[in-house]
Amino acid sequence: MVYIILGNGFEEMEAVCPCDMLRRGGVQVQFAGIGGRLITGGNGITVQTDCTVEEMDLDAMEMVVLPGGMGGVRSILGSEAALNAVRYAWEQDRYVAAICAAPSILAKLGITDGKKAVVYPGLEDQMGTALMQDANAVRDGKVLTGRAPGAAMDFGSLLLETLKDA
């Protein structure tokens, strides 16, 4: 199971595009909402999630995905349940993926330390000791990162390729 965590203000392209690509590839994906099941993105599109972050089945989780959007990033950082899900995935050697501003969350948790990564241009100073790359999407072991909304398809392709090769 892949969980894509959504908080109000998330970037819609960075959530829906990878979800669509994964589902077309036969991967089971669920949106998990912070604070409820109706989550509104930064551009006003409301998504009904499959579950809340508290209802996620962490043992069944192969990958957790964090879309960007500054509001969504703030929502994730303010949710202990969401942060615990990310920590759990990392500690259990599962895949952890983030795009746009969301890789900064992984940096705050120490997940990108010494790892190749990308982040939304201008946020590189929030990436700690990550090894910043010039690419749309990057994988380093179990850590996958994407640069920006325009990289959503490359990011989704990388997620699918990673899971299909696992």
Regions found by a protein language model. Give the residues of each.
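Short, thiol/selenol-centered motifs that function as redox-active sites or metal-ligating centers
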Residues: 99-100
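Anionic-ligand binding patches
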Residues: 117
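Extended, subdomain-level signal for the structured scaffold at the beginning of enzyme domains
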Residues: 1-96, 105-114, 125-166
